[in-house]
Amino acid sequence: MNKMKMNGKESYFWKNKEYIVLLTAIQGCLILMRARANGIYHAQLRRFHDVFSMELIMCIISSIIYSRIKELIQPLAIVLQDSFKTFALLSIFFSHASLLFFYIYLPDNSLISTLLKFNTILSLMLALFLTTAGYAVTRSAPVVNRVNVKIRNLPLSLDGFTIVLLTDIHIGPTVNKKRIEEIVAKTNALHADMVAISGDLVDGFLSNLIQPTLPLANLKSKYGVYYATGNHEYYYGDTNEWLHYFTTKFNITVLRNTNRNLCSSSGDCICIAGVDDVLTEKLRIPDHHTDAEHALNGCSQTQPVILLVHQPNGASKILRSTKKRIDLILSGHTHAGQFYIVWLFAYLKNDFLYGLYRIKNSDTQIYVSSGVNYWGPPVKMLNLCEITLLTLRTSS
């Protein structure tokens, strides 16, 4: 999967300004009609206006959800794609119909009334199926998502340079040592030039998680393992204890507003930089803050620059504040929405949700991983527990 998107979120609906103008005009007319109406006519008009507005909001949400479903099922066979699309459209249709039937009288012996029990059972079975399937995803081995990234003026000696991106490992109460061993083994099997960990590596106190973290010592790559903090590292005790532990026990290079140059045998170099998570700006922890300018100091403007930033919103903030060269930002945090009932909130809250984006009017790209594991309940949508293998390619 290699998705290129412009400026993050753009659904078909928002690209068509005539729809916005038409709907605004309709809303204006309804408001004027309500203002001039009296008695029962006013009450009926108000009811119609309420239903129209709710259906409009649901249409916007449905459009976003359907476009996202189409993206998620692209890797599947055509027959499966059609099945998922049909199921999604039927679900959307019945969701809209259920709102209308709230205002339409149905006789006691109507088909819908007689099927009420069946519909309730079907809903419960569907919820159970989706939850069970989501749990199975988190118990299965992570998928390897291979992505080619074209970098402007990438030296030929670095063409084909590979990076394994791991995000949101969330070592904690439900992510045990065996799971980490599985992730490490699958990562090492890719024989990447570099391993990048973009935040949320741990989700607990150091004293409780020493054993589950031990397999991290076996992570291997040609140029080493590089790591930048996420928000969850700041939720448990002293973050510096974790950072010292990673550095001394596992030989992981922690990039706290710093960078390293990785050079090929011909002398061509890539600058890999990382920043503290943007959450530090709210927490006001001494010596912890996001400082992209400092992180990029020492990165030549003539060499490719890769920046580890855990949260996509933090990446957006950096792009608005710096003019220094950044070719590729590696992020996570969103879990690609993780599960159906929270996907919309993740979509609306984050500037970039999942996949490879090219920033408009620049040479900067950002890849947002769906994460190796999960946050909270151990459920996730299909193929969203991922290890990403990024291959850099030369682009003139």
What are these regions (language model features)?
Residues 76-82, 107-119, 144-154, 176-190:
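Alpha-helical membrane-embedding segments
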Residues 11-20, 24-40, 48, 93-99, ...:
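Binuclear metal-dependent phosphoesterase catalytic core
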Residues 1-140:
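Non-catalytic terminal accessory segments
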Residues 153-396:
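Soluble catalytic domains of enzymes that build or remodel membrane lipids, polysaccharides, and related
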